[in-house]
Regions:
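Enzymes that bind and transform nitrogen-containing heteroaromatic metabolites
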Residues: 1-159
Length: 159
């Protein structure tokens, strides 16, 4: 299973449920990488989707502890259940938020990390894969600058 996330220099990923700084290059990268894949997302992150609708061109899976139906989503109630669905998919990607990343990281072997070179005041963080001996940066896929902010799209693999 794979995951995709944008992190700031301090590995922050958001504040109060939103991305303080979002780059159009990262949004494009996200669309390219997730198109056609199964995406696993938390219920609170769905609230940030346009119209709270499923992402088009993807199989949308919501991971939540709540017993609920979400139109357009397959709802699962445990990381194990999400991982099992992911194993049966051609490609499955964890797309957040913070709690879902923490729960699903043990099931992932590939991480697409956009490093955004700034440090806004985050309250939610992704584990620092550079400090984790179980993960290795294998490739910088793309780099650039947008609105004066540098970024790199990086590929990490579990070793």
């Amino acid at each position: 299973m794979e995951l995709i996330v944008a992190v700031y220099d301090d590995w922050g990923i958001g504040r109060e449920g939103t991305q303080p700084i979002a780059l159009s290059a990262d949004r494009k990268f996200f669309r390219q990488m997730t198109k056609g894949a199964m995406v696993i997302v938390g219920r609170r992150t769905i609230d940030d989707f346009p119209g709270k609708q499923p992402l088009p061109g993807r199989v949308n899976v919501a991971l939540t502890r709540q017993d609920m139906q979400i139109p357009g989503f397959t709802v699962v109630n445990s990381p194990e259940e999400a991982a099992q669905l992911g194993k049966n998919a051609e490609r499955a990607m964890v797309i957040g938020g913070g709690s879902i990343y923490r729960q699903m990281l043990p099931y992932c072997d590939t991480a697409y990390i956009t490093k955004v070179h700034t440090t806004p005041n985050s309250d939610t963080y992704f584990p620092n894969l550079d400090a984790d001996p179980a993960w290795c940066l294998t490739e910088v896929l793309q780099s650039g600058e947008e609105n004066g902010i540098g970024y790199e799209m990086c590929l990490y693999k579990r070793v």
